[in-house]
Curated annotation (Swiss-Prot):
This is Glycerol-1-phosphate dehydrogenase [NAD(P)+]. One of its GO terms (biological process) is phospholipid biosynthetic process. Its main location: cytoplasm. Belongs to the glycerol-1-phosphate dehydrogenase family. The gene is egsA. The keyword Methyltransferase does not apply. Zn(2+) binds at D160, H241, H260. InterPro entries: G1P_dehydrogenase_arc, G1PDH, Glycerol_DH. It comes from Pyrobaculum arsenaticum (strain DSM 13514 / JCM 11321 / PZ6).
Length: 342
């Protein structure tokens, strides 16, 4: 008999033109007095200040993500306004101090805008605090704001969504071979997000209209809900993400060109090949929307790619994927050459 299950998902999701103006109504539901707004460094700081102005009746501090003192516990509500880093730091603060979290994304480059989890790099850095899990109580996605984000970031959001088909296949494999717990519902949600973006990819690829962003945001939020239901990032992060993380770790500070969602899209192609899936279709969609289809296009040489593919399985030994116990260098080279990623 299965044991008791529980999960947390956002209670309130508001998205569309001008959604940011609804922030006071959302905040009012939570009886907060002292509010911390965590922002980015540039344009996102302007949006954070706009939110602070809307909340002028409260005690509000706006702090850049790289200046937040996570040990300071005086706030009873935290808002993450910006892209990945401000939202991740807001999740950390929320987790450490049990402060409710509201996410206000200014871009849509990955599914972190709705998930309870932080990036791999930050989770490793914060490992001494345990697994960082902070499900947003609300997501306010102003599609007018997101439409103004660089189109490359929005296309990276499509890249991140392409990965869901491999992530679910990896999860199914782990369920069959290792007896890992599997949620059909969470997997279906993740795959639905993948299908939504693939079926609309050609129409939305230029992100010239609000409705284009709306499709992307809906799909990314669906992924966040899938992870909340699964109780892990499993339905949305498999071998394709391990490859992306491995590349990012190898490049470190030298990574000046590659965006996470772009790496995920490329990882999806090679992992689909290893799974025996139709990797050419995935690559065709990536090309249609203007995502890179070779590693060279984003400044990654063959040696780094091969090293990443042979070491990716070591990043999360607890997460079984198509990589199994790892690929040898020749097998990795062959996979990357066959898929014409190098």
């Amino acid at each position: 008999m299965k044991q008791l299950e529980s999960f947390e998902i956002p209670r309130t999701v508001i998205f569309g033109p001008g959604a940011i103006s609804k922030t006071p109504q959302v905040v009012a539901k939570h009886k907060a007095e002292r509010i911390l707004i965590i922002s980015g460094k540039s344009v996102t700081a302007n949006y954070a200040n706009e939110v602070a102005h809307l909340l002028s009746g409260y005690s509000v501090d706006v702090v850049r993500y790289d200046e937040v003192d996570t040990s300071y516990s005086k706030y009873d509500l935290v808002l993450g306004v910006g892209g990945g880093r401000p939202i991740d730091v807001a999740k950390v603060y929320s987790y450490l101090h049990r402060a409710p979290l509201i996410v206000i994304p200014t871009s849509a480059s990955h599914d972190g805008i709705a998930s309870p989890y932080v990036s791999y790099a930050l989770s490793q850095k914060m490992a001494s605090h345990g697994k960082i899990v902070a499900s947003p109580i609300a997501i306010i996605a102003d599609t007018t704001v997101i439409l103004n984000a660089p189109s490359r970031l929005l296309k990276a959001g499509i890249g991140d969504l392409l990965g869901k088909i491999v992530a679910v296949r990896d999860w199914q494999l782990a369920h069959r071979l290792k007896g890992e717990e599997y949620s059909e519902y969470a997997a279906h949600l993740a795959l639905t997000s993948y299908r939504i973006v693939v079926s609309n990819a050609f129409r939305i690829k230029n992100f010239t209209k609000e409705e284009d962003v709306r499709v992307l945001v809906k799909a990314l939020i669906g992924c966040g809900v899938a992870m909340g239901i699964a109780g892990s990032s499993r339905p949305c992060s498999g071998s394709e993400h391990l490859f992306a993380h491995a590349v990012e770790l190898l490049l470190g500070e030298k990574n000046n060109e590659a965006i996470h969602g772009e790496l995920v899209a490329l990882g999806t192609v090679v992992m689909a090949y290893l799974h025996g899936m139709n990797w050419r279709r995935i690559k065709r969609v990536a090309k249609e929307v203007g995502l890179p289809t070779t590693l060279k296009q984003i400044g990654i040489d063959a040696d780094v790619a091969i090293e990443a593919l042979t070491t990716a399985h070591t990043l999360r030994p607890d997460r079984y994927t198509i990589l199994g116990s790892g690929l040898g260098k020749e097998a990795a080279r062959r996979a990357l050459e066959t898929t014409e990623l190098i």
